[in-house]
Amino acid sequence: MKNFDTGRVQDKLINRLERQEKQQAFQRDRFFKFKLPEIHRTLSQTLLMEKIVETDNSAAFSDVLLKGLKKILKTSEFDFKYFIAPIRNLVPRPNPISLYITQYILEVVINEPDVIDVYGTDKEIYQAINKIISNINIKFERAEEKILEQLSHNSSLVPGSRDYEIALDQLFHKTMGEPTGGNPQ
């Protein structure tokens, strides 16, 4: 009797990978919604102070950068991956947000009339951006862990339940403030 491969193992693996990818995208979006003002402010200052971007109008550069950061929130997963494809092998295990911002600077910001030039290699620009994103992300993850720890002390809440999700959302908003979703002012 022949043993036919039904593909169940592959289907399970594919489903697990897709679920994992969706979870990462959800966490990335939540991080970005709550930390957009801080990312925008720190990134603008650092890129100008480290002379990675030279401009004669820093406000215009800041606005262009903000437009790119907001674009991350609105872009589809396919468009996101397509946009970072030219530099996805820049470093091993890259941060997707840092890659996106790097590519945005290399493709869009460099062509702005108020930007004189962008200095540094692709890798140097990525490393400067990734340092900022990583530092902000570490703070965000610590705050997130504290929130989850607070919820774990409440025995009436079961992870995954609707009450748990509501309590998590309320505690998140109380601790982090309201998500800006693109309005850093």
Spans of features found by a protein language model:
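Charge-biased, low-complexity intrinsically disordered regions
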Residues: 1-24, 30, 37
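Helix-boundary capping/turn motifs
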Residues: 15, 76-77, 142-143
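Long amphipathic alpha-helical segments with strong coiled-coil/leucine-zipper propensity
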Residues: 26-112
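Short acidic, glycine/proline-enriched loop segments that cap or flank alpha-helices
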Residues: 31, 53, 93-97, 113-121, ...
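Amphipathic alpha-helical interaction surfaces
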Residues: 49, 71, 75, 107-111, ...
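Extended, amphipathic alpha-helical coiled-coil scaffold segments used for oligomerization/tethering
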Residues: 81, 121-124
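Alpha-helical oligomerization segments
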Residues: 127, 131-185
